[in-house]
Regions:
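Short cytoplasmic-facing helical segments at TM-TM junctions of multi-pass membrane proteins
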Residues: 110-132, 215-218
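Final/C-terminal transmembrane alpha-helix of multipass membrane proteins
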Residues: 218, 224-241
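Hydrophobic alpha-helical transmembrane segments of multi-pass membrane transport proteins
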Residues: 75-118, 203
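Active-site cofactor/substrate anionic-group-binding motifs, chiefly glycine-
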Residues: 38-91, 95
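Selective transmembrane-helix segments that form parts of the transport pathway or gating/packing helices
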Residues: 39, 43, 47, 87, ...
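Membrane-interfacial helix-loop-helix connectors in multipass membrane proteins
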Residues: 60-84, 152-194, 202-221, 244-246
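Hydrophobic alpha-helical transmembrane segments that constitute the membrane-spanning cores
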Residues: 49-52, 96, 133-162, 195, ...
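Short, membrane-interfacial amphipathic segments enriched in basic
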Residues: 1-29, 207, 212
Length: 246
C-alpha cells in the first residue's frame, strides 16, 4: 500500500471514529480509564525528564555564554523560553509518542489479531468509535496538564542546579525567568500540545487497527506508529512555529 492510500485509509478511519457514541456512559468510563493510563501513568517520567532537562539547559547555557556583555539573568531567560517554546511541548510529546503511542498501537493491534475487533463488528458495534475515540480525547485532555507540570518542573530543575552548583546566583536566575515574560508562549505551547496529542493517539490507533498477522506484525505496527508520528510532529512543529510566531 502506497503513502496516498494509507493517508486515505487514515482519514476514512477518523471519519468512523468521530461520531457520537451510542452509549455515553460507556464512553466516559472508557475515557476515564484512558486518562489514568495515558496521563497519570506518564507523570513520573515527565517529572524526571523535565527536572533534569531544566537543570542541563541552565548549566549548558551558563557555561557556554560566559560573556561580560551578557547580563547574568540571560541564562534564566533562555532556559525559560526554551522550556516554554519547545521542550515542554515538542520534546515531551516526542518522548510520550514512544510510551503512549506504542502502548495504544500494541493494545489495539492485539485486539485485531485476536479477532476481538471482528467480533465487535459482527455485533454491530462501531469498533473504531468505541476503541479509538476515548483514547484520542483522553490524551488531548491530559497532555496540556502534563505540559504544565513539565514547565514547572523544568524551571524548578534550573533553580535546583543554580542552588546546588552556584553556577548562577539564584536571584539572577529568578530575575531571568520573570524578565520580559510573554504569556502567549504558554498558550502557543498548549495549542501545539493538543495537536501533537491528537497526532500521536490517532496515528497509533490507525497502525494498531489495521495490524495483520501475529505478534511480530503488532510489534512492527507499534514501531511504525512511533516513528511516523514523531516525523509528523516535527513537521507540524515547523509549520505551527512559522504560523504562530512569525
Amino acid at each position: 500500500m502506497n503513502g496516498i492510500e494509507r493517508i486515505g485509509e487514515y482519514f476514512l478511519l477518523m471519519g468512523r471514529v468521530f461520531r457520537l457514541p451510542d452509549r455515553w456512559r460507556m464512553f466516559w468510563r472508557q475515557m476515564s480509564k484512558e486518562m489514568e493510563k495515558q496521563g497519570l501513568q506518564s507523570i513520573l517520567i515527565t517529572l524526571i525528564v523535565s527536572v533534569f532537562m531544566g537543570a542541563i539547559m541552565t548549566l549548558q547555557t551558563k557555561l557556554n555564554t560566559e560573556n561580560p556583555l551578557l547580563p547574568a539573568y540571560s541564562t534564566g531567560l533562555v532556559t525559560r523560553d526554551c522550556i516554554l517554546l519547545e521542550f515542554s511541548s515538542t520534546i515531551l510529546c516526542l518522548l510520550l509518542a514512544g510510551k503512549v503511542g506504542s502502548n495504544i498501537a500494541s493494545e489495539i493491534g492485539t485486539m485485531r489479531i485476536t479477532e476481538q475487533i471482528d467480533a465487535m463488528e459482527i455485533m454491530g458495534v462501531n469498533s473504531a468509535n468505541y476503541l479509538i475515540l476515548p483514547k484520542i480525547v483522553a490524551f488531548m485532555v491530559m497532555m496540556p496538564l502534563l505540559v504544565t507540570l513539565s514547565m514547572f518542573m523544568g524551571l524548578l530543575g534550573g533553580y535546583g542546579i543554580s542552588a546546588i552548583t552556584h553556577v548562577l546566583p539564584i536571584s539572577e536566575y529568578l530575575l531571568g525567568i520573570q524578565y520580559a515574560f510573554i504569556p502567549f508562549y504558554v498558550w502557543y505551547s498548549f495549542i501545539k500540545t493538543v495537536i501533537f496529542a491528537f497526532v500521536i493517539a490517532s496515528m497509533a490507533s490507525y497502525y494498531g487497527y489495521y495490524a495483520r498477522g501475529g505478534a511480530l506484525e503488532v510489534g512492527k505496527a507499534s514501531t511504525k506508529a512511533v516513528v511516523n508520528s514523531s516525523i509528523v510532529i516535527l513537521l507540524l512543529d515547523v509549520v505551527l512555529t512559522n504560523l504562530m510566531l512569525n
